[in-house]
Every structure is written in C-alpha cells, then in structure tokens.
Amino acid sequence: MAAVGASATLLTNTKSAEEPVRPVANFPPSVWGDLFLSFSLDNSMMEEYAEAMEEPKGQVRKLILDPTMDSNKKLSLIYTVHRLGLTYMFFKEIEGQLDRLFKEFNLEDYVEVDLYTISTNFQAFRHLGYKLSCDVFNKFKNYDSNTFKESITSDVRGMLGLYESAQLRLKGEKILDEASAFTETKLKSLVKTLEGSLAQQVKQSLKRPFHQGMPMVEARLYFSNYQEECSRHDSLLKLAKLHFNYLQLQQKEELRIVSQWWKDMRFQETTPYIRDRVPEIYLWILGLYFEPRYSLARIIATKITLFLVVLDDTYDAYATIEEVRLLTDAINRWDIGAMSQIPEYIRPFYKILLDEYAELEKQLAKEGRANSVIASKEAFQDIARGYLEEAEWTNSGYVASFPEYMKNGLITSAYNVISKSALVGMGEIVSEDALAWYESHPQILQASELISRLQDDVMTYQFERERGQSATGVDAYIKTYGVSEKEAIDELKKMIENAWKEINEGCLKPREVSMDLLAPILNLARMIDVVYRYDDGFTFPGKTLKEYITLLFVGSSPM
C-alpha cells in the first residue's frame, strides 16, 4: 500500500509450507534517523517565551476590541490573526466583534469597496463560521456577458483574495466556482511578472490555498510575508513569532517522546518490513490540532496511528492471505489469549497494541471518558476487517464495483481510526453527546472521509497497479461506469471538490457541535491534501513532508 489506509496487497503462493513468498515493498528508509531523539526541552526557555507573549497579547486584544477602529480594518485584523494561527487566544473577543459586524452588514456599504478589502472581509467571516453572502462579488462581473471584468486583473492582491475566497464556496455558489477558475488562470499567467512578497504569496496560494493547507505551516509562511507589509501591526507580528517558537519547543518535546516510545517498542526490529515514519505521522496529527492544550492528545493519536502503520504494512507488504485471516480474527477477539494463533513475528506488536489500549482505557476511566478509547479500538477492529476484505479481493482477482469499493474503502482509508483516536486525549469537550454526534456520521464527517479516500486513490493508483495492489477507486470507477482513466479521475476530483463544499457548509453557524470538535475533521481533510495533492508524500516523504518537518522543527523563527 502506498498510503496509510490504502488497499492491501497479499501474495498467497508459496515455495513451500515453511517458506512463503511475500510481497516486496522496498519502502524508502526514514530520512531523519534519530535526529529528534536528541532534543532536550529547555523549560526555562518555554517560560521566557510564555512571559514575553503577555505584553503583545494584551496589545493585540486591545486592537481587536478597539471601538474606534473602522470595520474594514477590524475585519482585516481578525483575518490576519486567523492566518497567523492565533484565533484560539482571542476566540471570545473575536466572536463578539464578528457577531456585531455580521449583524451590521449591509451589501450597499460595499458598493465603493475594492476587491482586496471585500475578499479579506469575506474570508474573515467565512473562516470563522459566518455565512456572508457571495453576492458581495457580483459588482466585479459584467452584467451583459456574466463574466468577470478584465479590469480586476490589474489588481493582483484583489485577485489573490478572490481566489482564496473561492476556496470557501458552498454548493450552488456559481459565482465562486467561476471566480476560482478565472483567478487561478490569471494568477498563473501573471506570477512570473511579480516580485517580492506578493510574488511569494501568489506562488504559495497557487501551490496550496490557505484553506487547504496545514494551519501551523500556513501561519509560519504567512508571518514571513506579513512582516513585509507596511500596514502591519508590530505587536501582532511579535506575538506570532513568539507563539511559533513556544509551540515549536513543546512540539519538539512531543516528537522526542513518541520517537523514544517507537524505539523502545522495537518495531523496526520485530517488523523490519514496515515504513519508519515517526516524524511524518506526528506531523500528520499536529495538522489536526496545534494548540498547546492538545499536547497529550497529539501524543496518544500519534502512537495509535503508528500502530496503524504497522498493521497496514503487515497486511500490505509482508503477510500471506492465511496470516492475514488469523491476524484479523485475533484483532476482532482483542484477547491476549489469541496471540498463540498469529504468526510469531507479529506477536510483539499484538501484545503492545492490547497493552497500550488497556492502559489508555484505565487512565480515561478514572475521568469517566473511557468511551472515546473504546470507539478508537472498535475503529481499529473495523479497519482490520476492511483490510481483510481487500486482501480477499486481491487474492481472488476480484475488482469491486465503485459503490462496493467505496463502502469498504472509506473504512480502509484509515480516516475512522485516525479521527476517533484524535478525540481520545482532547479532554472534557469529548462528552457523551459529542461522541454520539460523531457516531451519527454527520455530513461533514462523510465529506472529509470521502476526501481522505479519493485524494489518496487519485494520487497513488498508478503506483498501486505497478505493485500489484488491489484495485483502487480509479479502477473501480472505470469498471463500473465504462469510462476512460482520465474521465474517471476527473469525476473523482469533482467528488472531492463537492466534498470540500460540504465541509465548508458544516463549519458555518449554527453548528451542531463546537468548532473544537469540527476543527480536526476539517484539518484531517487538509492534511490529506498536504500529503497527496502532488505525490504520495507518506511513502515517499522526501519532498513536501520533509520540507514541512524542516520548517516546523529544525531552526526557530528569527525574532
């Protein structure tokens, strides 16, 4: 399998009963080695950063609450705070301001306002859950031809803002569908003529719009550009840099902890065929929530996802069909007594898996929150059964229909395991009601799950074919609907695009649950985009993920 949660490949032919022929994956080794094991947390430095943040934090709070500030400037400030990853620090203040500004909104007030300002205001509202009408962009279209005015192409900042705004579109917002295509084409043609910070911003946005990027990385990239702006608030820039450096120390310590745990578990010795991807998995989980209060949650979710990598690569790159059947049965039983029935090489993993979950359940039972651990465990059992089904398909040469593939493929995408495991350490916000909402499989969750499956398939299907993997969504779509490969990929991309619109809708007020619970769902879709937009970034992490890990964990932000 090329990705965490992709389809499994199992060879069943053997040379003899004692010497099975196994798949050969030849996964690239870790590019990091033991680099992050050597980190030593300087608590005094963290305290210094925390203390140093207090003054600029107070100054930024005053700016947000300033009653004399023009509404456009206020929305620009709020948008910048959000881009810098600081919204959680001022959530109540920002929500109070946006409540007031949204109630006061009048389309007529925007008649003389420029495209850049309107785009900034639109994003400030939409990113934070307020459904500002896309009619604010109507004035930039020709009424006779219903096309965008060519005059806006001279306003590069405005076009960039419109392009970013279009990523927040909902179903039926045709003007934003058109805006996305129009601005992308124009910006691509102009980018080579631009210079300085603006050129960098356009390149970054075309590569990956902010809305589909990893929040921590986007914040780091944004303050590098923000410091070049003449209208910047120095207190906000200072806070952003201190905040980044503070988080970096905390997160490097978390990465050291999970790296040491991985080494102590000796998985690379007992299951040497697996991918060694500790920093990459930690990065993935960090993409779900970066706030300091979720430190324990990140450590727990990283460990569980690393368990998933071992399981996945065992099904995909080592085990025979007979061994997979035995392992699946053992995971369904979830009983140490089942260890004798599974191959010896996977027994250490099985014991550690059961022990870690038992310890987690014991710890959270004291807080009355063991149900989140149980939900994670059940998701782990589900994915084992899903992997087995794909293995049986591969073993028999069966290509599933697209609906049949998707029913199982949404399970084997690993989305359910990762998303439910992300809840385990989040604390009191994961109440019984919150878990019940999650288990109801709401539309936003379905949409994020679909992106996880299909984005992976679109990027990895060729590699999967070359390795003799079971059929992907691309293959299933071709078989079911009798279309060409290109047509199948185009249709899957449309499904992904529509799923993003459903996620956008699900994040708007009124919400069924708090944004604290919605954010990991949104951010997991974002991380799928990060990992699979241009390549299989997990199996071959030497490009995007290496760049991100270097940016976040190697070297601090210059003050």
Curated annotation (Swiss-Prot):
Motif interval(s): DDXXD motif: 312-316
InterPro entries: Isoprenoid_synthase_dom_sf (IPR008949), Terpene_cyclase-like_1_C (IPR034741), Terpene_cyclase_plant_C1 (IPR044814), Terpene_synth_N (IPR001906), Terpene_synth_N_sf (IPR036965), Terpene_synthase-like (IPR050148), Terpene_synthase_metal-bd (IPR005630), Terpenoid_cyclase/PrenylTrfase (IPR008930)
Binding site for Mg(2+) 3: D456, T460, E464
Named cofactor requirement(s): Mg(2+)
UniProt cross-references to PANTHER family, sorted A to Z: GERMACRENE-A SYNTHASE, OS04G0344100 PROTEIN-RELATED
Annotated residues for binding of Mg(2+) 2: D312, D316
Provenance organism: Helianthus annuus
Function: Sesquiterpene synthase involved in germacrene A biosynthesis. Germacrene A is a precursor of several sesquiterpene lactones.
SUPFAM superfamilies, per the entry: Terpenoid cyclases/Protein prenyltransferases, Terpenoid synthases
Entry note: cofactor: Binds 3 Mg(2+) ions per subunit.
Protein name stated in the entry: Germacrene A synthase 2
Record lineage: Eukaryota, Viridiplantae, Streptophyta, Embryophyta, Tracheophyta
UniProt EC number: 4.2.3.23
Family per record: Belongs to the terpene synthase family.
Domain notes: The Asp-Asp-Xaa-Xaa-Asp/Glu (DDXXD/E) motif is important for the catalytic activity, presumably through binding to Mg(2+).
Assembly with partners or alone: Monomer.
